Curated annotation (Swiss-Prot):
Pathway: Isoprenoid biosynthesis; isopentenyl diphosphate biosynthesis via DXP pathway; isopentenyl diphosphate from 1-deoxy-D-xylulose 5-phosphate: step 5/6. Belongs to the IspG family. Its EC number is 1.17.7.3. This is 4-hydroxy-3-methylbut-2-en-1-yl diphosphate synthase (flavodoxin). Its cofactor is [4Fe-4S] cluster. Binds 1 [4Fe-4S] cluster. It is an enzyme of class 1 (oxidoreductase). NCBIfam families: ispG_gcpE (TIGR00612), PRK00366.1 (NF001540). It comes from Magnetococcus marinus (strain ATCC BAA-1437 / JCM 17883 / MC-1). It catalyses: (2E)-4-hydroxy-3-methylbut-2-enyl diphosphate + oxidized [flavodoxin] + H2O + 2 H(+) = 2-C-methyl-D-erythritol 2,4-cyclic diphosphate + reduced [flavodoxin].
């Protein structure tokens, strides 16, 4: 197996916070999260989506609490959720207090928009009592009026100034359990804002491109923006914001981390884009394998190459490999040929091989943890 060349800078050192059972920042793995888009008051629908997001590999899930009934629903959600939950709160400090009382693991608020200093103090006191961190979420689309007047339009400098203002509110109350996000729909503005803030504070940073768009365009924008920052060692948790099923956000988030060698979840399929030389239907096989192997969490590498031009070389670098060969496709395992399979048997054989390797990896991990 060849060694992967890393372009990623050393991770920025941040002050860790604890979101339920998940550490964010410090030396913890970069966590991946998403947000439900159901009516939070609809417990069956919201719980079903939380479980689906968690099943996809999410470390954290955020729920919106726009009213008191939604905040009250947090109690039942926390009791049945398989991962820690974050409450998204705006304007009304009573919603934050209710979510805290119901056991939420983290708050996403802007201290400056939930009322007077006394109200902020009340929320911080309740968060401190429960050791619940607060994410300051700055968004280019909702910057303070005075900042828009000062800078003329949303910009990285205005976002950083807003973040520092909210950070200072919590610091003045001696509450350092903070993480911060600075999101814009513009990739360049977002990257510049995170770079600037990263040079000024050591709080964990939640990365994201807000309102990134649909599945294709949003994934590309997020991969570029988040990828740039992660490669510079900036970022402790991330959300890929898509106008799509939240489960897809988790998949794309892990794909970004996987591409940078920062964190792997599931099977990494390397496949050719196909041409006239393909000896089997690569696109159909890859689509079927993605579906059949979606349940696997172990970082198994798999190459699916349609011909002998690049196939053998790729197969030698992956745990399982397939090289097209006129109806008799070569199979590889750990760089060695192990036989041939016809097109009809190909998918089933590869699934069996990958599942067997994943099981070996699980067993080895369990043994190591038990020792």
């Amino acid at each position: 197996m060849a060694h992967t060349v890393s372009l990623v800078a050393p991770r920025r050192q941040t002050r860790p916070v604890q979101v339920g059972s998940v550490q964010v920042g410090g030396d913890a793995p970069i966590s991946v999260q998403s947000m439900t888009n159901t009516d939070t008051r609809d417990l069956p629908a919201t719980l079903a989506q939380i479980h689906a997001i968690a099943q996809a590999g999410a470390d954290l899930v955020r729920v919106s609490c726009p009213d008191m009934a939604s905040a009250e629903a947090v109690k039942a959600l926390v009791a049945q959720a398989p991962v820690p939950l974050i409450a998204d709160i705006h304007f009304d400090h009573r919603l934050a207090l209710k979510a805290l009382a119901c056991g939420i693991h983290c708050l996403r608020i802007n201290p400056g928009n939930i009322g007077s200093t006394a109200r902020v103090q009340e929320v911080v006191a309740a968060a401190r009592e429960r050791c619940v961190p607060i994410r300051i979420g700055v968004n280019a689309g909702s910057l303070e009026k005075q900042l828009l007047e000062k800078y003329g339009e949303p910009c990285a400098e205005a976002m950083v100034e807003s973040a520092l203002h909210h950070i200072h509110i919590l610091e003045d109350l001696n509450y350092p359990e903070i993480k911060v996000s600075l999101k814009a729909s513009d990739v360049g503005m977002t990257v510049m804002a995170y770079r600037q803030l990263a040079s000024k504070v050591n709080y964990p940073l939640h990365l994201g491109i807000t309102e990134a768009g649909g599945m294709r365009s949003g994934s590309v924008k997020s991969a570029i923006g988040l990828g740039l920052l992660l490669a510079e060692g900036i970022g402790d948790t991330l959300r890929v914001s898509l106008s799509a099923d939240p489960v897809e956000e988790i998949k794309v988030g892990f794909d970004i981390l996987k591409s940078l060698g920062l964190r792997s979840l599931g099977v990494n399929i390397i496949a050719c884009p196909t041409c006239a030389r393909q000896e089997f239907k690569v696109i159909d096989v890859v689509a079927e394998l993605e579906r059949r192997l979606a349940h696997i969490r172990e970082p198994v590498t798999l190459s699916i190459i349609g011909c002998v031009v690049n196939g053998p070389g790729e197969a030698k670098e992956t745990m399982v490999g397939v090289v097209g060969g006129q109806g008799e496709n070569l199979l590889y395992q750990h760089g060695q040929t192990i036989g041939k399979r016809g097109d009809a048997e190909l998918v089933e054989t590869v699934v069996e091989q990958v599942e067997a390797i994943a099981q070996q990896m699980r067993a080895a991990k369990e043994k190591a943890e038990a020792e």
